[in-house]
Amino acid sequence: MSQPGPFEETPPHAGRHEVLAIQQRNLRRLLTYVWHCSPFYRRFYADHGLCERDLGEVGIRDLPPTSKDVLMAHFDCVVTDEQLRLADLQAWIERDTPPASLFARKFIVLHTSGSSGRMGIFVYDRAAWRRILARMNLPHFDDGADARVVYYGAVHSRFAGAIMCACVLGTRYALSLLSVLEPHTRNARQLNEMRPKMLIGYASSITTLADLALTGALDIHPKIVVVSGDPFTAEMRRRVESAWDVPVVNLYSASESLMIAISPPGAAEMCVLDDLQIAEVLDEAGREVAAHETGRLTLTNLYNLSLPLIRYKMDDFVTKGALAGSPPFGTITDICGREHEMLPVRLADGAVDDINPIMLTGCGGFDIPGLERLQFVSRAPERVDILYAGIDSLEARIGESFRALLAAKGAAQTVTFTVSRVDALAPDSGTGKVPLVRMAPRV
């Protein structure tokens, strides 16, 4: 099988039942294709007792999960195109090609930061990219091809945000990429000159720009703001909406799937694009969590066949939303953190355990009015410095919440901590994002 069957598109106004039926048919298409074209998946499934005739009926939960470490270790056997070889892709990335460049003139290449221990490389073919382009219809924005769009994030490498903007929005509008690693005052001057009509970037960096706008240092008037890349708290939304009274869209995008979920302007929940992927939110035992519960996201990308991701364990923890009425798509209410943002703490018995990032957000008692952003700096398992951006005098509330976490963990007597307010939390020099947990150099 050299060519897959056609990807089934979701018609406008489709109901939930129809969306899920299309999802299942596209899953069958994907499984049939990888059985014939991906040596890794064919062997992987056969080793778990599956054969080709099972692919027409097997449920998603009957398939074994995969991970970044597994797929990167077997990359050359996972991909379905012989032009894709990990060593060649790594060498191409190191050449620092322009964002809109294509590998072998046909593949769009992204990579992760490697902060979790191994850099992930993800490849999309033109068909997958066209599918994303067709879905990237942002509301309240029809200013034409000469409209200025600015992406504000990490632009020094092939991270998903910059590449997606260059390859999708760059084909429609006058796009500029602005590095979040440059001084904010310099970026504000450039933005004042650019006067963008659409502003896109990490939630943390867009909030910083909103603060500059509220003080008068930034004078731009976008018609729409799109945030992505890191969690967007209620306080951050309030500040952005105070700076610009325009629609604010929260896009959940990752290297593994460029459009996982999106929130319409004014909506608290994000709609999962169930026709493009299967998003399972699972507990530690691998069971689907109930509505309003938090679990780890396991993703099956249905639209990208070049590097198939099937039951792929993401690093993200999300809170599952409810299905009120009969919406076509499922929802998530919060992106709580990432697996590699665990905070190590010393327990009373001398052992070292981790506090899950879920508990370092609003899920763990940090949903505090006026609190914009937190960062937990681990100096040692016995010492944590908590930095926060927000209004004055929140130290006691933050300390109370963290003390309760330590007590529940059995570390209240063995871990000391400080809480300090800062004007802004500095982004990571590699990713441009503000990490929830930062490991300070051990002294």
List the model feature ranges, each with a label.
Residues 147-149, 297, 384:
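Conserved hydrophobic helix-helix packing surfaces used for dimerization/oligomerization
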Residues 199, 303-413:
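AMP-binding/adenylate-forming catalytic core of the ANL superfamily
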Residues 175, 248, 279, 415-419:
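Generic structural signal for residues in well-ordered beta-strands
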Residues 232-324:
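Conserved AMP-binding/adenylate-forming
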Residues 183, 232, 281, 393-394:
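Glycine-/small-residue-rich active-site loops that bind phosphorylated ligands and cofactors
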Residues 117, 286-287, 350, 432:
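Detector for glycine-centered tight turns/loop "hinges" at secondary-structure junctions
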Residues 1-10, 69-224, 228-244, 257, ...:
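Active-site phosphate/ATP/adenylate-binding loop shared across adenylate-forming ligases
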Residues 1-111, 117-131, 137-144, 219-220, ...:
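Nucleotide 5′-phosphate-binding alpha/beta core
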